């Protein structure tokens, strides 16, 4: 029940919560994109062999992760716009479409990363360096020994450790992207009144909230001006 309350979108807390989710998506998307770029530059560029064949870990960990990071940033920006323009249907549909696509992509990325980490741990990283070390698929031979070791342009033990150190954070960030995108989907469905997320009277509450926001801003500006005027009068009395 508590989880349902947190995921629900209402007129009181929904806009601010949607804005925070949008900011979180932008942050997580940028970090995930950066991790994918570092992973490619430090590890996976050594894995791609000259023949153009790429290991499955490369595809799942880098391509999908980078795409999910870029899309998460886009969803975060749309969520920020939707939180400030609650009565624009186009933003609702755009948020729903992008968030749903990002939810599926982030979930696929999480499953792919989990599979890549599991396979890499299971075979001790030998699958990552199979093209450079064709003779090291034998589990009885250490990674830093065996035929082909001297021909490899990188340290295979560092490739294994670095790949896991970057994959595991990317896995958690992809899962976070999926959860945040799911909330954006719920918010968009609630704003459009579709399916079980429909709430009676929500549009009227949002219209009242939109009308009250300019009045509240003006009231705060008047209060600030009054405080400044009082401070100025107090300063004049002090000088006198």
Swiss-Prot record:
Major location (coarse): membrane
Short name of any one Pfam family annotated for the protein: BCLP
Subcellular location: Membrane
Membrane topology: Multi-pass membrane protein
InterPro entries membership: Beta-casein-like
Keyword annotations of the record: Membrane, Transmembrane, Transmembrane helix
Parts of the chain that traverse the membrane: 21-41, 63-83, 95-115, 163-183
GO cellular component terms listed in the entry, alphabetical order: membrane
Statement: the UniProt record of this protein carries the keyword Transcription: no
PANTHER family: KERATINOCYTE-ASSOCIATED PROTEIN 3
Name listed for the protein in its UniProt record: Keratinocyte-associated protein 3
Gene source species: Rattus norvegicus
Lineage, broadest ranks: Eukaryota, Metazoa, Chordata, Craniata, Vertebrata
């Amino acid at each position: 029940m508590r989880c349902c309350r947190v995921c629900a979108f209402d007129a009181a807390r929904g806009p601010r919560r949607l804005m925070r989710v949008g900011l979180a998506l932008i942050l997580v998307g940028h970090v995930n994109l950066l991790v994918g770029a570092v992973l490619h530059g430090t590890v996976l560029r050594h894995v791609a062999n000259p023949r153009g064949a790429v290991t499955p870990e490369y595809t799942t960990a880098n391509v999908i992760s980078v795409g999910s990071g870029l899309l998460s940033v886009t969803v975060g920006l749309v969520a920020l716009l939707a939180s400030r323009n609650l009565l624009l249907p186009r933003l609702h549909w755009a948020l729903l479409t992008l968030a749903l696509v990002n939810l599926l992509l982030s979930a696929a990325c999480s499953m792919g990363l989990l599979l890549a980490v599991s396979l890499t741990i299971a075979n001790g990283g030998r699958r990552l360096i199979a093209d450079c070390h064709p003779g090291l698929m034998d589990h009885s031979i250490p990674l830093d020994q065996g035929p082909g070791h001297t021909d490899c342009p990188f340290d295979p033990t560092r490739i294994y450790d670095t790949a896991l150190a970057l994959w595991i954070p990317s896995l958690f960030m992809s899962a976070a992207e999926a959860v945040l995108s799911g909330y954006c989907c719920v918010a968009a469905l609630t704003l459009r009144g579709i399916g079980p997320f429909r709430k009676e009277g929500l549009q009227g509450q949002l219209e009242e909230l939109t009308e009250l926001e300019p009045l509240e801003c003006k009231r705060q500006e008047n209060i600030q001006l009054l405080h400044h005027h009082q401070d100025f009068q107090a300063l004049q009395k002090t000088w006198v």
